[in-house]
Amino acid sequence: QEILENIPLEHMQLTSDIITYAKKNLNVQLNQSIYITLTDHINFAIQRQAQGIQLKNALLWEIKKFYHQEYLMGKYAIDLLNEKLGTKFSEDEAGFIALHFVNAEYDTTINDTFAMTNMIQGILELVKQEMDIEFDEESLHYERFVTHLKFLAQRLYRHELLKDEEIEFAKLMENKYPGEYECSKHIAEYIEKEYGGQISGEEIMFLAIHI
């Protein structure tokens, strides 16, 4: 509540309109905290712009690719703000706003969301190199794989990883698809080394299925 005390009413109303639009178009449950966090973010972004400060979004490309619907909500937000307030927000800011919707959707922090986005990109690069393939980013298989990686990252940060319950099927996968299974084990090693998380044999098996 204290955060909102010094924020202009117009900024609060515009943020509320943006969230209402996003709820309708994303068709997901959003954590109620977004009303405070996004209002604070937008107010601060307006202040920064008034001072001539522009922030580059280092993850903009990844956000547009992995969280495209949330990015479109961010784009709607900057278009509305630019129209109503005369600001000149770029798509960098649309990306930052998109992350707030990702946080509210997956119930994570902004730092976790940055880390999860980097992790997904790192895994995709690893698979491309190990399997010597190029992804068709328009394909349903690619979309399903990215969706699986998003939920894997979410489970990792929530400490809700799958337990080893499909041991026999995992062995079958390892024997039938040794290359894909080996690649999945390398993904597990990458996650442990870079993010300190250990994933189960069942998680490795599901990665192999998608690969």
Language model feature labels by segment:
Residues 1-211:
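A cross-family "folded-core" feature that marks the main globular domain of proteins
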